[in-house]
Amino acid sequence: MLIIGHRGAAGVAKENTLESLQAGLDAEADILEFDVHTTKDNVPILVHDGNLRRTHKTRVSVGQSTLNQLQKVADKTDYPIATLEEVLDSFFGKIILNIELKQRDCAKHVVKLLKKKYIKKPSDWNLVVFSSFYTSELKTVRKLSQDANLWLLHNRNPFIFIAYARRLGLNGVGFHRLYVNDFALEIAKKTDLFTYAYTVNRPHSAYLLSRKGIDGVVTDRPSTILTEINRRQA
């Protein structure tokens, strides 16, 4: 079972920062997951919410602010804002990167950056994965690259992927940890989809999911989960 570091390693460092991603890499996660929005001037940055209220204690909107404006806000705190380009410069090629597209209309800017600077040959697409709850964003990625890996995220209904698997050419499906349905899991596996659950922070829960045959778990504490899985398999 693969360990996917949630927002890097959000349980041990500030989420969606270079520090958190490095912590996930150091913890020997198999994949690093992080969230991407685009700024008013179309720069992809790492942030989970549409505003900075939770992370920076201000209601400043991400999509209505330029990168420069957002960085000025961040400079007044101890919470840096990383651009996707900075992240790719630091981690592309070292580990598989799971880019979650959190905002409508951001996919095209993300793919443009990847094609411009990082993707040099078709096999390079295997170094990144795109995930989203928005099928429209995954559709955009697929239009721009037939080689991209697409994972559709689900909330309560674990069967939504069935309607989109062939249409979007999905490669994987992410289930909410509380709604991992055995039948849905079976269908996904029969259609050769990578299956994973989010966000799993209890070691025993991760172990039970591994027994179900799920392929991966997203966790804030990759080191803790990895240690438990290895202990049980020893």
Task: Report the location of each language-model feature.
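Phosphate-group recognition and catalysis centered on beta-loop-alpha active-site segments
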Residues: 1-234
